[in-house]
């Protein structure tokens, strides 16, 4: 299998370490691509970092001829306040992976997008250059119809207003809750709100707090999926 090199998430105070790790990985290895979740590391606990920092990382890759792949499966289609998290960037990725909210979560469907440069690399009469990749459900008519309906709704004035309304609600709640003694950190981006709970034994992502939180919400008629000691909406 191909080796995967991981770098630190470029959160506040960690920027230099992250850039140096990426540059070192490129200079000491034959790197095919830099794969990242833009602005929000979802399953890691909704860890957020700035567009400016990601721009710098992508710039390093472009300078060194390393392809960049944005995993927007979670962040895409309005989650961050814009259609894509990459819309906050100056530097754009070479590829994007999209799914989940593409169909409003109703039918499984995914899209991989490429720059024209990459597309042209496979567009040739010579079959040796073709990208022989496909699957049984390519261009599923029902999935495509659901995706078109979802995109139309996303672009509507009502949906865009709701995104802004939710974002402002999150900011207001953040101001109220962030000084609570049981709250360690809070963060907001678009319609994403994350709250990290302070625990006595400093449990985090892999602690037991997740089960306690999940059961508490279920008992109160609320369906949420805490990530460790982090509650997100």
What are these model-predicted stretches?
Residues 1-232:
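Conserved N-terminal phosphate-binding loop of PLP-dependent enzymes in the Aspartate aminotransferase
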């Amino acid at each position: 299998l191909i080796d995967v090199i991981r770098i630190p998430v470029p959160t506040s105070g960690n920027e230099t370490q992250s850039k140096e790790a990426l540059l070192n990985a490129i200079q000491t290895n034959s790197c095919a691509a830099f794969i990242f979740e833009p602005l929000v590391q979802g399953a890691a606990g909704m860890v957020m970092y700035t567009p400016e920092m990601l721009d710098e990382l992508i710039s390093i890759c472009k300078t060194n001829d390393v392809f960049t792949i944005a995993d927007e499966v979670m962040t895409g289609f309005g989650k961050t306040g814009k259609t894509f998290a990459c819309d906050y960037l100056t530097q754009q990725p070479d590829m994007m992976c999209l799914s989940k909210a593409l169909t409003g979560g109703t039918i499984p469907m995914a899209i991989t997008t490429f720059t024209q440069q990459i597309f042209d690399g496979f567009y040739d009469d010579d079959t040796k250059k073709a990208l022989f990749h496909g699957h049984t459900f390519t261009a599923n008519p029902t999935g495509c119809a659901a995706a078109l309906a979802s995109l139309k709704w996303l672009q509507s004035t009502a949906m865009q207003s709701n995104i802004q309304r939710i974002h402002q609600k999150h900011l207001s709640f953040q101001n109220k809750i962030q000084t609570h003694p049981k709250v360690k950190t809070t963060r907001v981006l678009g319609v994403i709100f994350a709250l990290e709970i302070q625990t006595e034994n400093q449990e985090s992502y892999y602690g037991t707090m997740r089960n306690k939180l999940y059961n508490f919400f279920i008992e109160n008629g609320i369906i949420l999926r805490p990530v460790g000691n982090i509650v997100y909406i």
